[in-house]
Amino acid sequence: MVLSTLIEPLPSVQSDPIPFPSGGGIVYVITDRRAAGERALTDIVSAALRGGAHVIQLRDKDVPARDMVALGQALLPLTRDAGVPLIVNDRVDVALALDADGVHVGQDDIPAEMVRRIIGPERILGVSVATVEQAQRAMDAGATYVSVGDLFGTPSKPDAGPPIGLEPLAEIARTVNLPVLGIGGINLANAASVIRAGAVGVAVISAVIGAPDPEAATRALHAVIASALDERARAG
């Protein structure tokens, strides 16, 4: 038997991945078991989708691949029904096993250009960046979008280092021809400033996953972001 027949990929369950949303006003929700507490992540994600979340990212650094796949299998029907992409953090193997819509990697994960070769040209590839140089490398590697942070400091990533503030985000948004999201400690009080700095949306964990009412929290973020986008457009 030829070796290539042993490693031939399984046929895809979904031939056309759901694309990354176009335009501005993106609310990008990242799962977190600690922020969820005793509540089921499936219930929280369902509520966020009802509230209008544009992207769901499956993130869990501390569980085996098998458990992450199981959670992804529970989330996929929810995101598919909503027409919203499901992106897997870091774990390319889990993303491929699920036939998820994309992968998000950080600076210490598998290099973005390698991930792009593995997942192919159609799936979403997100990259965490903190500098213009990192953002340019991500763009050259075939990234679909970049998330810039940690902006304000976040308990969800205690090893993230000191917050970088909004100026690096503004510089990246001016320089790189990719959608730019802000991430790191974003909430209703500061989301507008992220949009005014040039981001097309915000990536959040606690602001939605940890909220008493995730649906209402997602809707409230929408309202704040929409207002900030209007303000930015009027300012020229």
From Swiss-Prot:
Mg(2+) binds at D90, D109. It catalyses: 2-[(2R,5Z)-2-carboxy-4-methylthiazol-5(2H)-ylidene]ethyl phosphate + 4-amino-2-methyl-5-(diphosphooxymethyl)pyrimidine + 2 H(+) = thiamine phosphate + CO2 + diphosphate; 2-(2-carboxy-4-methylthiazol-5-yl)ethyl phosphate + 4-amino-2-methyl-5-(diphosphooxymethyl)pyrimidine + 2 H(+) = thiamine phosphate + CO2 + diphosphate; 4-methyl-5-(2-phosphooxyethyl)-thiazole + 4-amino-2-methyl-5-(diphosphooxymethyl)pyrimidine + H(+) = thiamine phosphate + diphosphate. Signal peptide: none annotated. It is an enzyme of class 2 (transferase). 4-amino-2-methyl-5-(diphosphooxymethyl)pyrimidine binds at Q57, L58, R59, D60, K61, N89, S128, K157. GO terms for cellular component: cytoplasm. Pathway: Cofactor biosynthesis; thiamine diphosphate biosynthesis; thiamine phosphate from 4-amino-2-methyl-5-diphosphomethylpyrimidine and 4-methyl-5-(2-phosphoethyl)-thiazole: step 1/1. Keywords: Magnesium, Metal-binding, Thiamine biosynthesis, Transferase. One of its GO terms (molecular function) is thiamine-phosphate diphosphorylase activity. Its EC number is 2.5.1.3. Condenses 4-methyl-5-(beta-hydroxyethyl)thiazole monophosphate (THZ-P) and 2-methyl-4-amino-5-hydroxymethyl pyrimidine pyrophosphate (HMP-PP) to form thiamine monophosphate (TMP). HAMAP family: TMP_synthase. PANTHER family: THIAMINE-PHOSPHATE PYROPHOSPHORYLASE (PTHR20857), THIAMINE-PHOSPHATE SYNTHASE (PTHR20857:SF15). This is Thiamine-phosphate synthase.
